[in-house]
């Protein structure tokens, strides 16, 4: 979702087809709209301008408009295949006038200061190595009083990954730059965020991932193989098995983050 500009896409059309078969149309991370709703639980997005960082195939961006009443949502990603899919889906659902999808290279976010009331992200920030610069940019583009709400995959510590975690990351073959919840909190504090909350979701995804693996090995195998090929499915079954080990050990820590940019005068 957030990668280097000159690399081949990590989320190409095959990856999109595979992940949508597992997680639902427009969703390239687990939990579907229900987990998105949990990330923004208790927040009002009605009439707000929202940025979705690492928007992928656009399902979440569209959900924030259609279900949560955002006045306008902008999806940002560095990869062309997912942005093309997101734009097509917005047209199909009649939401093109309330959404914008932006493809741009990694680095400073391509938006003016104080552009958004809300910045959202779902399991994409792990692709960004420099957490301090990332959150400084998020803070910059938020309006005073604005909210940051996200879910992200993290590691339970800031030392070297265990052999099992190294094996899992190698199996994924993606540009992971995982950091601990404590490291994310520190980056948010340095950027200026206040009232920061960090909510662990390991227990939830540990169980969900086990169900996903069972589905891939069972009822989904033939259907998904017809769409992407059995070799691709077999590779991902191996990846899920490696991921389950680090979820069970607690080293893999899916986590929710939330913080506020102070209103002017505070």
Where are these regions (language model features)?
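A short glycine-rich, Lys/Arg-flanked "PGG" loop and its adjoining helix->strand segment in the class I
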Residues: 132-147
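Short, glycine-/aromatic-enriched active-site segment of Class I SAM-dependent methyltransferases
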Residues: 154-175
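A short acidic, Gly/Pro-enriched loop at the edge of an enzyme's catalytic core
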Residues: 107-118
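Short alpha-helix
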Residues: 177-191
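Class I SAM-dependent methyltransferase SAM/SAH-binding core
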Residues: 51, 57-108
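Conserved Class I S-adenosyl-L-methionine
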Residues: 197-266
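A short SAM/SAH-binding and catalytic strip from SAM-dependent methyltransferases
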Residues: 118-130
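Conserved alpha-helix/loop element of class I SAM-dependent methyltransferases that forms part
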Residues: 29-46
């Amino acid at each position: 979702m957030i990668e280097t500009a000159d690399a081949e896409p990590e989320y190409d059309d095959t990856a999109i087809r595979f992940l949508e078969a597992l997680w639902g149309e427009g969703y390239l991370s687990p939990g579907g709209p229900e987990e998105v709703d949990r990330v923004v639980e208790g927040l009002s997005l009605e009439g707000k301008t929202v940025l979705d960082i690492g928007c992928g195939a656009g399902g979440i961006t569209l959900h924030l408009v259609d279900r949560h009443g955002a006045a306008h949502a902008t999806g940002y990603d560095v990869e062309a295949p997912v942005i093309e899919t997101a734009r097509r889906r917005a047209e199909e659902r009649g939401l093109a006038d309330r959404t914008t999808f932006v493809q741009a290279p990694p680095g400073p976010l391509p938006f003016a200061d104080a552009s958004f009331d809300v910045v959202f992200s779902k399991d994409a920030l792990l692709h960004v190595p420099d957490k301090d610069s990332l959150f400084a940019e998020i803070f910059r583009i938020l309006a005073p009083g604005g909210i940051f709400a996200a879910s992200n995959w993290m590691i339970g510590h800031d030392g070297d990954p265990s052999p099992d975690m190294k094996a899992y990351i190698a199996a994924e073959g993606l540009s992971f730059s995982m950091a601990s919840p404590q490291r994310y909190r520190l980056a948010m504090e340095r950027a200026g965020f206040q009232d920061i909350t960090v909510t662990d979701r390991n227990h939830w995804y540990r169980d969900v991932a086990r169900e996903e693996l069972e589905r891939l090995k069972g009822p989904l195998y033939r259907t998904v193989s017809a769409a992407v090929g059995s070799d691709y499915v077999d590779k991902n079954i191996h990846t899920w098995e490696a991921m389950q080990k680090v979820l069970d050990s607690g080293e893999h820590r899916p986590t929710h983050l939330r913080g506020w940019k102070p209103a002017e005068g505070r």
